[in-house]
Amino acid sequence: MYEEFLKQIEEFMFIEDKPEKADVIFVPGNGYPQMAEKAAELYRNGFAPKILPSGRYSITAGRFTGVLDKKECYCGTYKTEWDFLKDVLMQNGVPEEAILKEDQATYTYENAIYSRQVTDREYLDIKKAILCCKTCHARRALMYYKLLYPDTEFFVSSCCVDSIDKNTWIMTNDGIDEVMGEITRIIKQFSLMLKKN
């Protein structure tokens, strides 16, 4: 029973799809370069014509707190998560004209809301989309993007940036705290969504 319950948690939390050709690649805001690097690789391999990184900074910090990994590669002065993610994309071969701009979001739900505003303003019909996000963040990010794009088929392409993934989360207290914290946020935030509808 215990092992089965753990497996159910892992299947719910850790989403990884085989990407298909899409209309856009979404990258929710963060200070890690890996998600934008993966988005750039997918772009270079012809999976989508546009990438939409999204983010100002975390609402809890009130400012962009800086690059969290590979600082030797990405050492610019970034005011927003979008500035940082754009630089990562361009350093990894994505032309500026393929990068859409959303630099106001301060949390995941806003990433989805403001991304929808951008794609609507650009008259983009998003039938299929790839979502590049942190491994632990995949379920919550997908929940919000799916809410704002209910008719879009999503493919999650996640990155393990903090050594917490489907195979390792249960091995450390940090991993357990991260996954259980995400589950708690999903439950709380989804309950608020249900009450609004």
Model-derived regions, located:
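C-terminal capping/extension of enzyme domains
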Residues: 163-197
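A structural signal for short, hydrophobic/glycine-enriched beta-strand patches
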Residues: 1-175
